[in-house]
Amino acid sequence: MFNETPVFDYEDIQLIPNKCIINSRSEADTTVTLGKYSFKLPVVPANMQTIIDEDVAEMLAKDGYFYIMHRFDEAGRIPFIKRMHEQGLIASISVGVKEYEYEFVTSLKADAPEFITIDIAHGHAESVIKMIQHIKKELPETFVIAGNVGTPEAVRELENAGADATKVGIGPGKVCITKVKTGFGTGGWQLAALRWCAKAARKPIIADGGIRTHGDIAKSIRFGASMVMIGSLFAGHIESPGKTIEVDGEKFKEYYGSASEYQKGAYKNVEGKKILLPAKGHLKDTLVEMEQDLQSSISYAGGRDITSLKHVDYVIVKNSIWNGDSI
């Protein structure tokens, strides 16, 4: 029962250190396996149009990182798969659940992508279950990620339908306003929702949304995530597809939600917004910093790889870990 579930979020939790057993943090192994493939980090940039495009996807794949291409260039998906496969790289795409997507999935038999993510806001739906079953029938070797969900019941149903991983998080993201527009979601208790869902899961969980610091990656792993999807921390880089805007001599980049009017092209069923982020440096530099910070997390956990993070103790400190400091 949910009433028995402790409610907390990332800023409420502090992990407790164990004795360090490695000589240098650089010895810590941050790699993760998803399906048949291993990746440098247990993180994936959000499959949003201001976060990833074909060039960013190619760069990530070449450097050994996981990626999920967004679904908003429907006609470009098959050429993208061919582009990646011609270079010996994995193809990881997104689909929706509309009728024409069934025909599209069937058309992929000749050149199936390694990963397909079923990407809708409310993933605990009969339409998602049907699409999982269709993909598994047509492309049995493709790893299927389904979401987004926020309850153990949803995780179990999608897994039982054939999903290889589920994405947990409804509305906790920086440019998502689902909780305000609908009254529903995991905003404000995303980490507790992750813990709740992970206890029911038999397959990998991808935590999606609410990540504000690199330390939140370690916390996500502690509470059951195999992979962590991140939007805002990956937005605003030189390589990011978001439009660059200059305000009073300072450069910013657009970052907007997939359910925003800017993505949809019309103000209809809007559950996302647009913000401007100060322009950052190169994406590779952020990835290196994430890796180094996660290596430090592993050293504090008293382990050699990310599995050690799953077993550390923690305290709930309720909104006090910043102690008046800002990030």
Curated annotation (Swiss-Prot):
NADP(+) binds at residues 205-228. One of its GO terms (biological process) is purine nucleotide metabolic process. It is an enzyme of class 1 (oxidoreductase). The active site is at C176 (thioimidate intermediate). Disulfide bonds: none annotated. Its EC number is 1.7.1.7. It comes from the Bacteria. InterPro entries: Aldolase_TIM (IPR013785), GMP_reductase (IPR050139), GuaC_type_2 (IPR005994), IMP_DH/GMP_Rdtase_CS (IPR015875), IMP_DH_GMPRt (IPR001093). The keyword Cytoplasm does not apply. It catalyses: IMP + NH4(+) + NADP(+) = GMP + NADPH + 2 H(+). The keyword Cytoplasm does not apply. Keywords: NADP, Oxidoreductase. SUPFAM superfamilies: Inosine monophosphate dehydrogenase (IMPDH). GO terms for molecular function: GMP reductase activity. Pfam families: IMPDH (PF00478). One of its GO terms (cellular component) is cytosol. Catalyzes the irreversible NADPH-dependent deamination of GMP to IMP. It functions in the conversion of nucleobase, nucleoside and nucleotide derivatives of G to A nucleotides, and in maintaining the intracellular balance of A and G nucleotides. Belongs to the IMPDH/GMPR family. GuaC type 2 subfamily. This is GMP reductase. It comes from Streptococcus suis (strain 98HAH33).
